[in-house]
Amino acid sequence: QPQQSYPVQPQQPFPQPQPVPQQRPQQASPLQPQQPFPQGSEQIIPQQPFPLQPQPFPQQPQQPLPQPQQPFRQQAELIIPQQPQQPLPLQPHQPYTQQTIWSMV
């Protein structure tokens, strides 16, 4: 009799865990469709850059020509204001004007 009572007890806990594993596979199923999406996007990405590459090559030589001209002018403008600031400290009466200019900035 005691031997029979042992198998009866384990039979009850077995059916209880059954509903738990049923929920777990449902979570795994949505993970599967997420994987194929990135695979499809990877194929689309390489197709786009191929046609875009030949287009920028002819445009690049035209754009850099006007660009270098602008920075040269900007550098020259920065050098000009630096020159008048140097002679100002040589004169005794103008250091006051320098203070006002720095305060305004």
Curated annotation (Swiss-Prot):
Membrane-crossing residue ranges in chain numbering: none
The keyword Lipoprotein is annotated on this UniProt entry: no
Tissues expressing this chain: Developing endosperm.
Coiled-coil segments: none
Domain of life: Eukaryota
Biased composition (Pro residues): 10-22, 48-69
Protein name: C-hordein
Higher taxonomy: Eukaryota, Viridiplantae, Streptophyta, Embryophyta, Tracheophyta
Molecular function in Gene Ontology: nutrient reservoir activity
Keyword RNA-binding found: no
Residue ranges with Low complexity bias: 23-39, 70-83
Region (Disordered): 1-105
Role description: Sulfur-poor seed storage protein.
Keywords assigned by UniProt, alphabetized: Seed storage protein, Storage protein
